[in-house]
């Protein structure tokens, strides 16, 4: 038999390896049969390219002809998709589209540009909510990336060109800005804002828009201001004309022009009427300010006069008048200082006294006075600097003054000045010593006699061998006066016992208007320097006058003191000094100087003198140097000496008492 083999056709499984694609179910297929191509699998970002018999995808499976012969696996072949990425720049510059495989990233293109905007990146959606990250995001389909933009903000700065500050502003591109408040600049007017430094293109805040950071430049015009001149209380002429000057330009201050003001001097201009501002002199320069300026004329008083001048001692001569500059004042010797009270007519002036500052209406500090002439200068300086000076010659009188003598032949005359300087009861000394020793006459004018008489002054004529002290109260003030002082020779033929004189012999006379004055109401003092004659006791010397009628010497008296014999007399004659013992006792002395009859005591003196003469004859035989015996004659001599001393003391007492009365 034939056994017949029974065959069962094999059924094979065909599996599908989708290689990442969607699942494809396996199918069973008989041997040598065809299989139906399954629905293509899907794989994101890929395109299906068919089934392949090998993993290397080199041998495609053709479902039309290929049959199944075994269990097999078909492998899906895929081709990665390439997508187009387009760029929507939203008004920016164009960006070319790019091709990119699925799952790949793309290189970020050069950022687009858009005027007035800043590029913020690419976004996957039109609403710009999801940014595209070129580092991590991958392409999965054809797509459009959308540019995102931010509008720019720009800073607008303002260049003030010296004006007040204006803050910069921020503004979006394409927007207008609000015009700021106009700046200020001293002395200038604001003309507007310009886009360029040269101020050629103005900025219009209504229409011009911001497109970048920018600076607007202020333009200014310089202002002009008036300078006005005010005469400020002037009373004549005209002020300079008003002028206009640009701010900060140099201004030259005008002069006085024809302005005038009585009693004042123009001293310049000031920015304040009362002179409290800035002061300018004509010709000064200054920079013009930022407002009109008025300059006020400034006037300084030229009054440098006093309204009153008061002195603490004496009287001004003449009476004070403001326009008279020179005055004289006499004060006594006891006044050692004075004060002056000057009162200014204008209190804006200043006053100084002998270069020491003083105050108007106030007593000055004490001004010391020297003996004689003291010149005090009172300087007034007016407000305008002009000056005026008052001179006050203060004569501080002296108690003892030497006369200024002028010799003419045998006589001298005197200058008035020294007499003016003499104080009340002062002594004017007429010095006739030395070269003037031979002068025999001193002449006084009527005016000088009057001055000396009014002052109750004394004149002392000084010779080398005689002092004569004469009170001028004795004389009439309306007559001139001559004093004759003539030294006599020691001629015994003219004057008995002249050779025995212990002093010079002088003839003294006083004449007024040619009339000899014989007797004086107030005694005149004589002082003789005496010489020592042998062993004569100087204290016993006496002054005598010569009586020409009897040709004899008559006693005046006297007191010895320090080399001088002093005596007083009420008349002038010829005078000399003798020791009583050196005159003849035979009536040589017969009466006192007043011609009074001798008293009983005087007669006793005569007796003593006669006895003394007899005794002297006897004593001549006694050798010199031998002590005389104490006889009755000597007793009388001592008695006589005592009487003489008593009389001399009485004379001194009378002399000083009379002198004190005269001074009182």
UniProtKB/Swiss-Prot annotation:
The keyword Lipid biosynthesis does not apply. InterPro entries: Cadherin-like_b_sandwich, InlB-like_B-rpt, Listeria/Bacterioides_rpt_sf. Gene3D superfamilies: Listeria-Bacteroides repeat domain (2.60.40.4270). GO terms for cellular component: plasma membrane. It is found in: Cell membrane. Residues 588-622 are annotated as: Disordered. It comes from the Bacteria. It is a single-pass membrane protein. Its main location: membrane. Keywords: Cell membrane, Membrane, Transmembrane, Transmembrane helix. The chain crosses the membrane at residues 636-656. Residues 588-616 have a biased composition (Acidic residues). This is Putative membrane protein Bcell_0381.
């Amino acid at each position: 038999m034939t056994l017949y083999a029974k065959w069962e056709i094999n059924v094979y499984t065909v599996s599908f390896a989708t290689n990442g694609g969607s699942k494809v179910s396996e199918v069973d297929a008989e041997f040598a049969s065809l299989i139906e191509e399954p629905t293509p699998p899907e794989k994101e970002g890929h395109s299906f390219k068919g089934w392949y018999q090998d993993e290397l995808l080199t041998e495609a499976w053709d479902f039309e002809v290929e049959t199944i012969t075994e269990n097999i696996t078909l492998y899906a072949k895929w081709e990665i998709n390439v997508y187009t990425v387009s760029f929507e720049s939203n008004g920016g510059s164009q960006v070319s589209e790019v091709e990119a495989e699925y799952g790949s990233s793309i290189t970020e293109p050069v950022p687009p540009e858009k005027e007035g905007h800043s590029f913020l990146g690419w976004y996957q959606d039109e609403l710009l909510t999801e940014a595209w990250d070129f580092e991590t995001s991958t392409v999965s389909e054809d797509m459009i990336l959308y540019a995102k933009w931010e509008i720019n903000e720009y800073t607008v700065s303002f260049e003030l060109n010296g004006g007040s500050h204006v803050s910069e502003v921020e503004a979006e591109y394409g927007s207008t800005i609000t015009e700021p408040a106009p700046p200020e600049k001293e002395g200038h007017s604001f003309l507007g804002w310009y886009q360029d430094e040269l101020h050629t293109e103005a900025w219009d805040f209504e229409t011009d828009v911001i497109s970048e950071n920018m600076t607007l430049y202020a333009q200014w015009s310089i202002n002009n201001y008036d300078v006005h001149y005010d005469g400020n209380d002037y009373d004549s002429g005209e002020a300079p004309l008003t002028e206009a000057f640009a701010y900060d330009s140099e201004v030259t201050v005008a002069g006085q022009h024809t302005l005038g003001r009585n009693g004042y001097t123009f001293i310049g201009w000031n920015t304040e009427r009362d002179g409290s501002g800035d002061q300018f002199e004509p010709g000064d320069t200054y920079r013009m300010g930022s407002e009109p300026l008025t300059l006020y004329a400034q006037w300084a008083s030229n009054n440098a006069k006093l309204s009153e001048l008061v002195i603490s001692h004496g009287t001004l001569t003449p009476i004070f008048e403001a326009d008279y500059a020179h005055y004289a004042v006499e004060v006594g010797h006891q006044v050692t200082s004075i004060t002056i009270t000057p009162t200014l007519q204008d209190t804006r002036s200043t006053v100084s006294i002998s270069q020491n500052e003083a105050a108007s209406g106030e007593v000055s500090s004490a001004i010391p006075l020297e003996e004689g002439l003291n010149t005090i200068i009172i300087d007034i300086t007016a407000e305008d600097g002009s000056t005026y000076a008052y001179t006050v010659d203060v004569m501080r009188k002296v108690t003892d003054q030497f006369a200024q003598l002028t010799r003419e032949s045998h006589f001298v005359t005197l200058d008035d000045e020294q007499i003016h300087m003499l104080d009340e009861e002062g002594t004017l000394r007429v010095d006739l010593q030395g070269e003037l020793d031979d002068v025999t006459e001193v002449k006084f004018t009527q005016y000088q006699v009057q001055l000396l008489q009014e002052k109750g002054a004394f004149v002392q004529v000084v010779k080398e061998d005689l002092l004569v002290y004469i009170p001028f109260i004795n004389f009439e003030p309306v007559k001139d006066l001559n004093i004759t002082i003539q030294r006599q020779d020691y001629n015994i033929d003219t004057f008995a016992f002249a050779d025995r004189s212990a002093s010079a012999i002088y003839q003294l006379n006083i004449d007024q208007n040619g009339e000899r004055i014989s007797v004086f109401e107030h005694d005149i003092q004589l002082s003789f320097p005496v010489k020592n004659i042998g062993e004569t006791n100087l204290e016993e010397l006496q002054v005598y006058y010569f009586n020409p009628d009897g040709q004899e010497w008559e006693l005046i008296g006297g007191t010895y003191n320090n080399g001088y014999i002093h005596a007083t007399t009420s008349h002038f004659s010829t005078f000399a000094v003798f020791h009583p013992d050196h005159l003849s006792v035979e009536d040589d002395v017969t009466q006192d100087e007043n011609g009074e009859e001798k008293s009983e005591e005087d007669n006793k003196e005569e007796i003593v003198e006669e006895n003394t003469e007899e005794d002297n004859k006897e004593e001549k035989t006694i050798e010199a140097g031998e002590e005389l015996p104490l006889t009755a004659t000597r007793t009388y001599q001592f008695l006589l000496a005592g009487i003489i001393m008593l009389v001399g003391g009485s004379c001194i007492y009378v002399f000083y008492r009379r002198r004190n009365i005269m001074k009182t």
